[in-house]
């Protein structure tokens, strides 16, 4: 059971103008981009050479909630937490890395570089979580930057990129002209452990769900079906390459498609950190 932090540590958002502190959630502006905001948590013990945990919001843009919910876990596990903010007007295609508009992957790399410089945290390998649309971004980031990723946890993505080179990105991993620098190395991304978490009540075809015919046919009709299918396909492709990679799929008890309820009822925070940092 996770011990709660003090009220100040768990809920405070410290303005950027205040010097960086430990044990509080800091709101910062990226030094190289005055329009880019992110939230940062540096644990009381740690920072220097600490691992970096990144949590990515979905279309609700609830970055503050992500930062507040995960701060206690970052403290307990001694990791530096980053929660990037991606407003829809700047990142209209962030779930797919950014084929149009600003490139969410490039901005995240800049944030990570700044945090590593400010805190001394290790940016060699990243530990990522995303919920809903944020989970779509996270697994596509893993596909594009496998050398930067240690492990990921995906919370109820609406649909997935498949490890299929005959299908054009973002449905598959066939490169596209609008992102020529992104090439996919299946041997590398299939080596990264992944856990998919979906609420056991997350079986509605709601307005936000991709209902295209091709996604329904290839992946299933609900987030539960699609998550299970993707884990099975990734595991199969890894085995074909002789890779003993861990892929996990878990249903969260009494949880619909809601970040807050999945954290409160479904134990999503505990399951996320248990998978990302099994040695801690």
Where are these regions (language model features)?
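Short beta-to-alpha linker loops that shape the active-site pocket of alpha/beta-hydrolase fold enzymes
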Residues: 85-89, 158, 255
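Short, hydrophobic alpha-helix immediately C-terminal to the catalytic nucleophile
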Residues: 109, 139-143
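Serine-hydrolase catalytic machinery in alpha/beta-hydrolase-like enzymes
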Residues: 31-37, 49-127
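The feature captures the conserved acid-bearing segment of alpha/beta-hydrolase catalytic domains
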Residues: 151, 159-239
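Alpha/beta-hydrolase
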Residues: 54-56, 155, 252
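C-terminal catalytic histidine-bearing segment of alpha/beta-hydrolase fold enzymes
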Residues: 231-280
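A domain-start/cap signature at the N-terminus of enzymes
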Residues: 7-52, 126-136, 145-153, 159, ...
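Bacterial N-terminal signal peptides
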Residues: 1-6
């Amino acid at each position: 059971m996770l011990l709660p932090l003090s009220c100040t540590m768990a809920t405070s958002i410290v303005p950027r103008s205040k010097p960086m502190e430990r044990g509080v959630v800091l709101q910062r502006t990226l030094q190289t981009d005055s329009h880019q905001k992110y939230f940062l948590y540096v644990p009381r013990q740690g920072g220097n050479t600490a691992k970096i945990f990144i949590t990515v919001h979905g279309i609700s843009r609830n970055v503050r909630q992500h930062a507040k919910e995960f701060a206690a876990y970052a403290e307990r596990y001694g990791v530096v937490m980053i929660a990037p903010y991606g407003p829809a007007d700047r990142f209209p295609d962030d779930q797919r890395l950014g084929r149009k508009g600003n490139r969410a992957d490039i901005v995240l790399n800049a944030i990570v570089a700044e945090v590593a410089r400010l805190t001394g945290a290790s940016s060699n390998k990243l530990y990522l979580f995303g919920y809903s649309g944020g989970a779509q971004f996270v697994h596509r980031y893993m596909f594009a930057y496998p050398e930067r990723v240690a492990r990921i946890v995906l919370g109820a993505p609406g649909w997935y990129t498949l490890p299929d080179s005959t299908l054009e990105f973002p449905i598959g991993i066939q490169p596209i002209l609008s992102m020529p620098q992104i090439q996919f190395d299946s041997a590398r991304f299939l080596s990264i452990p992944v856990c998919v978490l979906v609420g056991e009540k997350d079986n509605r075809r709601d307005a936000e769900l991709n209902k295209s015919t091709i996604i329904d046919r290839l992946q299933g009709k609900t987030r539960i079906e699609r998550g299970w299918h993707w884990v099975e396909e990734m595991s199969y492709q890894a085995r074909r390459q002789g890779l003993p990679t861990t892929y996990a799929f878990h249903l969260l008890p009494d949880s619909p498609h809601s970040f807050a309820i999945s954290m409160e009822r479904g134990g999503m925070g505990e399951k996320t950190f248990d998978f990302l940092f099994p040695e801690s």
